[in-house]
């Protein structure tokens, strides 16, 4: 049996939601609409996303509705009970997460802090949500003098530990993070990722190094990626995908520096021979602009992505399928700094398909994984549905 598509390239525009989800009120996210609010007042067009049909999913500034879209289009709602990166990505690959990860907007509980101090023999300082650059500017010199651990979090379910590489050697920092990872698997903490955040430099001129390391939880079940790998297909993880799934189901992992490097790496992968999926996360939308409520920066990042699409399209093969989607929202005009509970856009196109239309809207993130699994004829997740029939493609 031949597969409809030999390769599927899945791109997650991290946090690029397309309007409040049906249960947004339960998350205090009524009225959230990342794309609409980001693009309001933006003066530039997004011609390639427009031609694909992004503006057909929902009315958007600077992105018009088109009569002949260049992709299948719809929007998907989230079934899982979280609105974080891991929950969104895990659901995309077929899981339904009913136990939400915990976030710590007021810092970590004293009980956990004491356990970390006891286990490591080092004092914990900071212990609050903060940007990584801000926290080392504030505590970096203190850390160099004392050897304390700078512990901080964000709007995501993460515990980050920053330390100067000359004060706490990398191997020791990694060992500390591994111990904290084990400690926080306890359901009463349930933190998604522990992140080592080493830095170098002198007071007033600290910089974080590329020696960051993430210690994630394994997905709470088998994903489509596991099924693909088990059946001999390639699963090429680009950007933070490998960390999000803790390597589960990944056959090759490629790190990226930023969104544009992510697109560079994807295009290099597209040029290679393989059979299976490439899976790219573009994190800058979320990390650099959404959480920081930087509307202008966010809009420009979407424009920059739009400009790269022709280059990607030029390297596609006849039996490739591209899927562009998101994992949650992060409305830059919403109160606070947290993610927002939103629908995600879904655009799917292939050189071998000429006529596109709207797909049904009655389903959830996991339908992406089901469609991929159906294409490669591997085990289908329990949740979601395949879009292959609606797309008019079948197994031969």
Curated annotation (Swiss-Prot):
Residues that bind Mn(2+) 2: 286, 291, 339
Any single Gene Ontology cellular-component annotation: cytosol
InterPro entries named among the record's database cross-references: Alkaline_phosphatase_core_sf, DeoB, Metalloenzyme, Phosphopentomutase_DeoB_cap_sf
Keywords: Cytoplasm, Isomerase, Manganese, Metal-binding
Cofactors that this protein relies on: Mn(2+)
Species name: Staphylococcus epidermidis (strain ATCC 35984 / DSM 28319 / BCRC 17069 / CCUG 31568 / BM 3577 / RP62A)
Domain of life: Bacteria
Taxonomic lineage: Bacteria, Bacillati, Bacillota, Bacilli, Bacillales
Cellular localisation: Cytoplasm
Family label: Belongs to the phosphopentomutase family.
Pathway assigned in UniProt: Carbohydrate degradation; 2-deoxy-D-ribose 1-phosphate degradation; D-glyceraldehyde 3-phosphate and acetaldehyde from 2-deoxy-alpha-D-ribose 1-phosphate: step 1/2
Residues given in the record as Mn(2+) 1 binding sites: 14, 327-328
The protein's name in its UniProt record: Phosphopentomutase
Catalytic activity, as annotated: 2-deoxy-alpha-D-ribose 1-phosphate = 2-deoxy-D-ribose 5-phosphate; alpha-D-ribose 1-phosphate = D-ribose 5-phosphate
Cofactor binding mode and count: Binds 2 manganese ions.
Role summary: Isomerase that catalyzes the conversion of deoxy-ribose 1-phosphate (dRib-1-P) and ribose 1-phosphate (Rib-1-P) to deoxy-ribose 5-phosphate (dRib-5-P) and ribose 5-phosphate (Rib-5-P), respectively.
MF GO annotations: magnesium ion binding; manganese ion binding; phosphopentomutase activity
S-adenosyl-L-methionine listed as a keyword: no
Enzyme Commission number: 5.4.2.7
NCBIfam families: deoB (TIGR01696), PRK05362.1 (NF003766)
One annotated GO biological process: metabolic compound salvage
